[in-house]
A protein has these predicted regions:
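Intrinsically disordered, low-structural-confidence terminal and linker regions
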Residues: 1-23
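Conserved glycine-rich FAD pyrophosphate-binding loop
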Residues: 5, 12-13, 96-98, 283-455
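A generic structural signal for well-ordered alpha-helical segments
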Residues: 17, 74, 83, 134, ...
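Glycine-rich N-terminal segment of FAD-binding domains in flavoprotein oxidoreductases
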Residues: 22-31, 38-146, 159
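Structural signature of FAD isoalloxazine-binding scaffolds in flavoprotein oxidoreductases
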Residues: 59-60, 90-111, 164-184, 209-216, ...
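Short, hydrophobic/aliphatic alpha-helical segments
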Residues: 66-79, 132-146, 186-201, 391-395, ...
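C-terminal substrate-binding/cap subdomain adjacent to the FAD-binding core in PCMH-type
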Residues: 157, 176-327, 334
Length: 455
């Protein structure tokens, strides 16, 4: 990107920002959100840390009208732009080299609804900020990720899975309606049967900004009565998880694989607001079980604050078909053991949920099998050289991902076009058609689809 073009774009943006009273950042200024000296406030970095791209400028709209004005300006000026929330992305999806970054965390309001069992929330709101006012009312989102310090629109743009996905599927499956801002600035009110919303959910920002969404709420308290089940191997964990998912009587199922003998997987299993019935766990193939205790993940998240990550975090998160993907899981597990606890201090996440047939959405990153297993490897590295070496080892597994019919959920590196096309399947044509309709100049979130550019 030439310095002359950067300078021209910045001059145009300063004029626009001055006239519209919209906050503009440039020349390495930090974002007004997040912890200092971390990727959270650095517009040139994201969670992955393996890429650094300096935008010509950043626009920080404070409401939907400002976001629309920013989009119209960017589109009229033909300036490519990336949409940024909490930047919990590993491959530079929220970065821009010489273009613009649109930071959406100013769109963070909770809006009134007629029903106590629904919520309307703006896309830049953190999940934690959504949950805190719901808790005293005995309400919760149906699915919540294990890191609530991410934005609503950010997780909905990729899918979003959590410890109740065995009951309700992905977070995108819960969206009932939305306000979508198209890349041109046009505002669209869409419902769950509208193709624009159906392809915006898990669409990685290709169709614009999820400015507001309507979500059904779960009537439950936040006190979780739980036990920790330890499994000698992943096969036993998968069998137990499928049984618990089929019974639909356990509210929470949160698991991590680790390298602490003699247990391969440990899973928190529990129910909200009532004691966990021991009969629900009878005959499950666990190797050991803890005494029951009461937990409050919301209070813990509020007290602990955002996770402390290493400077560099290469990542590969895949969704495996069951049982055919268990061979690849063995390879992923072998790599995790080789990387060791210094790079995977928390182990890695596992989640069993139903496959693609359980979702009505076209872009959900789920295989066609009845059951699927999400495996999330996010090694922590202290140097860029170390991270690049680890990333190369993760990247080497992509041919196996394709061979078993698995889906990539997140990756810190570009995914081969053939694998992206296979994952999108026939839905690629419809997504491409919608993209050309709402973003004819191809300015919004270029490359955010695993590095793939829709033709």
């Amino acid at each position: 990107m030439s310095q002359r073009l950067r300078t021209t774009r910045l001059a145009l943006a300063r004029d626009f920002a001055s006239q519209s009273r919209l906050r503009l950042l440039s020349d390495g200024e930090r974002l007004p959100w997040g912890r200092r000296e971390t990727f959270e406030s650095d517009p040139a970095r994201d969670f992955g840390g393996l890429q650094q791209q300096q935008p010509a400028f950043v626009l920080c709209p404070a409401d939907i009208e400002q976001a629309q004005a920013a989009l119209r300006f960017l589109y009229d000026a033909a300036i490519p732009f990336s949409l940024r929330g909490a930047a919990h992305s590993p491959a530079g999806e929220v970065l821009s080299d010489g273009g613009a970054v649109l930071d959406l965390r100013g769109l963070s309001s909770l809006l009134p609804t007629a029903s106590p069992d629904a919520v309307r929330v703006q896309g830049g709101c953190h999940w934690l900020s959504l949950c805190l006012p719901l808790a005293p009312r005995g309400r919760a989102p149906r699915v919540l990720t294990d890191n609530p310090h991410t934005t609503v629109a950010g997780t909905l743009s990729v899918g979003g899975f959590g410890d109740s996905s065995h009951r309700f599927g992905l977070q995108v499956d819960c969206v009932r309606a939305a306000t979508l801002l198209l890349p041109t600035g046009q505002r669209c009110e869409v419902t769950s049967d509208d193709p624009l919303l159906r392809y915006a959910l898990a669409g990685r920002g290709q169709l614009g900004i999820l400015a507001e969404v309507s979500l059904p709420l779960w009537r439950r308290g936040w006190a979780l009565h739980a036990r920790v089940l330890h499994f000698a191997d992943v096969t036993s964990f998968v069998a137990a998880s499928i049984h618990l998912a089929e019974t639909q009587r356990v509210d929470c199922l949160r698991a991590r694989a680790h390298a602490v003998p003699p247990h391969a997987v440990s899973a928190v299993v529990g129910t909200y607001g009532a004691e966990l019935d021991p009969a629900l766990l009878r005959d499950l193939p666990y190797a050991a079980i803890s005494e029951p205790e009461w937990l409050d993940f919301l209070a813990h998240a509020q007290q602990a604050g955002p996770p402390g990550w290493a400077p560099y975090n290469p990542a590969l998160e895949v969704v495996l078909p069951l049982p055919s993907g268990l061979g690849l899981l063995s390879e992923l597990d072998a790599l995790a053991h080789a990387l060791g606890p210094e790079r995977l201090p928390r182990g890695y996440s596992l989640q069993v949920l139903r496959g693609r047939g359980a979702s009505l959405l076209p872009l959900v990153p789920l295989p066609d099998s009845p059951w699927a297993l999400i495996v999330a490897l996010r090694p922590e590295c202290q140097t860029l050289d170390e991270a690049q070496q680890v990333q190369a080892r993760l990247q080497a597994l992509l041919p196996r991902v394709a061979a078993v019919g698995a889906c990539v959920y997140l990756a810190s590196f570009p995914v081969p076009a053939s694998l992206v096309e296979a994952q999108l399947g026939p839905e690629r044509a419809t997504l491409g058609e919608l993209k050309r309709r709402v973003d004819p100049k191809g300015l919004c979130n270029r490359g955010a689809l695993f590095g793939y550019v829709l033709a």
